[in-house]
């Protein structure tokens, strides 16, 4: 069961992030496959179903991904003005050793280059699919005084340049 179509986009992202973290943790604990492509396909579909007029999604095939460095492109659109902002996104899944072993610097460089030369220009990002077990409270306090649970970081985004500068992220939690 996916997010309700009455949710705002932020609530949908939060719901899918928690679902990603939970399902990924369960799959690793049980030794079952829950692949990066499955997570991507499921989340993109849920977002498109819940917010068809706010988000335009274009998923790249493997040939286009090799050239662009991106798994998908998002356009967040302001309906009345028909203006939007574009993101080129590459996904990486945390493995059972809590690393992003599939990270390739050449792919990150392709993502940065392709997003900058595409017209209209898109912003290059990574979306990291993360898991923790057991779930814990991590991160800074929110404006409401509460800490976010680790499930809130199930889908975490970072600008691609930061990822490249960090030479491939690792998590030691």
Report the location of each language-model feature.
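Active-site metal-binding core of divalent-cation-utilizing nuclease and nuclease-like domains
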Residues: 58-68, 77-79
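Residue-level signal for short segments within beta-strands and strand-turn junctions
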Residues: 76-78, 93, 130
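Extended charged low-complexity segments that act as oligomerization/scaffolding linkers
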Residues: 1, 11-20, 105-109, 114
């Amino acid at each position: 069961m996916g997010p309700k179509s009455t949710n705002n986009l932020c609530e949908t992202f939060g719901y899918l992030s928690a679902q990603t973290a939970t399902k990924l943790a369960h799959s690793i604990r049980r030794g079952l496959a829950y692949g990066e492509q499955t997570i991507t396909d499921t989340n993109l579909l849920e977002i498109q179903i819940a917010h068809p007029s706010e988000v335009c999604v274009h998923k790249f095939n493997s040939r286009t991904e090799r050239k662009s460095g991106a798994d998908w492109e998002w356009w967040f659109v302001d309906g009345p003005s028909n203006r939007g902002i574009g993101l080129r996104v590459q996904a990486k899944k945390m493995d059972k050793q809590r690393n992003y072993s599939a990270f390739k610097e050449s792919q990150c460089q392709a993502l940065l280059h392709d997003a900058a030369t595409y017209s209209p220009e898109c912003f290059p990002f990574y979306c990291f699919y993360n898991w923790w077990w057991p779930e814990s409270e991590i991160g800074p306090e929110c404006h409401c005084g509460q800490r976010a649970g680790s499930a809130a970081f199930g889908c975490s985004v970072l600008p691609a340049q930061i990822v490249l500068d960090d030479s491939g992220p690792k998590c030691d939690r």
